[in-house]
């Protein structure tokens, strides 16, 4: 596993790459977390047969904060940062996996990269512009997701909501480290309808999409996701694992198996 910082127009971003000749899979983390959340994928069975690329979004983990937060800290800005990472790595064909915020970034990338072979979205309901109330459950923790400054109790409560109990120490550190301007700007942009209509984007996409959520996710409206028409929904259904908002961590074995099967189907043209 090699790690290096890559210079992009959104700042220097920390990228880790397992290398090899396997199918490239870009993993994008969520709001106020870091690439470390995918530890059980990088160290688990998913790394066999795939080239895994994880990175810290601008304003997160070991990446730099954005010099121009108004432009970078939007779904479009973060999607552009991810696209630049792929360009610099020389990857023109890739499967993209995104969790929570990362899932929304991945959907935003659909119109930017012709070489996206498949999409895996976790905890990321594709909502219309101004449609957050449809896709998300009413939760006090969503307010924390959009606040610049968080108290220690808010950090703990937010961590429990997005990752479950116990809150892993690395996640608490990631929340504290993250640039609060990113949280604030993302929600400002969502309220004003910036970015693509995500429901329309997936409903018009010919890219195979795997939808994997936790059956006990406290933040998203699973029933809403079932109303979305994905033209190439993998296995013809949305998968629900025995977990909360982070099934890739709490149900890692089953999750990794599903993603491995999806990757194989994509490469064989069977997805």
Locate each region found by the language model.
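Conserved loop-alpha-helix segment in the C-terminal half of the alpha/beta-hydrolase fold
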Residues: 45, 206-243, 249, 254, ...
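Conserved HGGG/HGGXW glycine-rich cap/lid loop of the alpha/beta-hydrolase fold
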Residues: 9-65
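Glycine-rich His-Gly loop
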Residues: 27-30, 100, 214
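Gly/Ala-rich beta-loop-alpha elbow adjacent to hydrolase catalytic centers
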Residues: 98-102, 106
């Amino acid at each position: 596993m090699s790690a290096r910082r890559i210079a992009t127009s959104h700042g220097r971003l920390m990228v880790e790459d397992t290398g090899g000749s396997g199918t490239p899979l870009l993993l994008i983390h969520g709001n106020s977390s870091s690439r470390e959340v995918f530890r059980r994928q990088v160290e688990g069975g998913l790394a066999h047969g795939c080239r895994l690329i994880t990175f810290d979004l601008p304003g997160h983990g070991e990446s730099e904060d954005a010099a121009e937060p108004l432009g970078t800290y939007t779904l479009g800005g973060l999607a552009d940062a991810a696209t630049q990472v792929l360009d610099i790595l020389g990857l023109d064909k890739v499967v993209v996996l995104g969790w929570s915020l990362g899932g929304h970034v991945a959907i935003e990338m659909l119109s930017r990269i012709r070489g996206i072979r498949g999409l895996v979205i976790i905890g990321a309901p594709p909502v219309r512009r101004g449609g957050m109330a449809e896709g998300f459950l009413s939760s006090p923790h969503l307010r924390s997701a959009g606040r610049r400054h968080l108290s220690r109790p808010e950090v703990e409560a937010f961590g429990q909501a997005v990752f479950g109990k116990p809150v892993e120490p690395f996640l608490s550190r990631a929340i504290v480290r993250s640039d609060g301007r990113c949280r604030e700007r993302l929600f400002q942009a969502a309220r004003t309808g910036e970015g693509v209509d995500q429901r329309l984007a997936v409903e018009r996409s010919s890219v195979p999409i795997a939808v994997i959520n936790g059956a006990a996710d406290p933040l998203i409206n699973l029933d809403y996701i079932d109303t979305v028409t994905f033209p190439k929904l993998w296995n013809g259904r949305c998968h629900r694992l025995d977990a909360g908002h982070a099934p890739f961590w709490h149900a890692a074995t089953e999750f990794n198996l599903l993603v491995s099967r999806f990757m194989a189907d994509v490469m064989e043209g069977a997805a």
